[in-house]
Amino acid sequence: MVSARVIVQAPSHLGLRAAGVQGLPEALLAAGFAERVGARRGTRLAPPAFDPAIDAGTGLLNPHGLRVYASRLADAVGAVLDEGAFPIVLGGDCTILLGITLALRRRGRSGLLFCDGHADFYQPEAEPTGEAASMELALVTGRGPDLVTDLEGRGPLLRDEDVVVFGFRDADHAAAEGSQPLAPTIHAMDLWSIRERGAELAARDALTYLERTGGPAAFWVHLDVDVLDDAIMPAVDYHLPDGLTWEELTGVLRTAVASDHATGLDITIFNPTLDPDGRVARSLVDALVAGLTP
């Protein structure tokens, strides 16, 4: 991994009906995140205006805004990559992954270590709320309306076989809600398989897969903080029991970013309006710092 780190702020909730996650960058930066991980503060990208109406043509909230924002975020992330630096993108909701993977796709083939409590594989016909933040993995692998899956004619942005879904625990809930199942061509490691193996060893297994001969040249790390145990991460909008501990998260991050193939990291879904005293933000920053520093 390169030593220089640059923070890109992407405070968008275009893919999520509830507001609050757009305050994530300010909350983590106020808790000292940039200074403690030795990162330079770079671009902050304000999102387009939020439209609460579901688009009739796509079944999504804000599809045109998502497309515009993805292009702008791809430019910002790409500029950091072109410096030879390591972008750390602070969301926002998980739809920022559209812009991130567009930046990667412009540069070739990339993998994704997708650390999330939810598989986020809903497609519009199964998601009546229109929230693309429950669909982003489907979208970046080419499932959904062309408006947001075939960005710049480059879709799908990721190949199924170049994705590891790590730490999800919503399979039963998602199936009951009518979500499409994860494609069998996507490498899936749910919370229970990770616990059986041990978080750090499971992370090494994930990297072995992503770094395989004939695989992608590099990979990105996506961190939705709801991969953490709900008991220690209450500042999220959609709750599930169980999840990773702080120590497990630290071990996973330390393993991932130590790889020469890791090109960047994004952090999403933390909602500081649900953390009025800042206690959870401070604990999150402590864990991130422990995972991102030698």
Q: Model-predicted segments: where are they?
A:
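Catalytic cores of soluble, metal-dependent hydrolases
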Residues: V2-I88, I100, R106, P184-P294
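Active-site flanking residues adjacent to catalytic metal/cofactor-binding acidic residues
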Residues: V8, G92, C115-G117, F166, ...
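Active-site histidine-anchored catalytic micro-motif
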Residues: D82-D150, D160, S259
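Short, structured patches in soluble enzyme cores that scaffold and shape functional sites
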Residues: F114-G117, T141, D162-D170, D190-W192, ...
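Short, glycine/acidic-enriched loop or turn micro-motifs at the edges of active sites
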Residues: A119, D170, V225-D229
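Active-site environment of divalent metal-dependent phosphoester hydrolases
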Residues: Y122, D172-A174, P272-L274
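A general structural motif
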Residues: F166-H173, T245-T250
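Short, glycine/polar-rich helix-capping loops at beta-to-alpha or helix-loop-helix junctions
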Residues: A171-A183
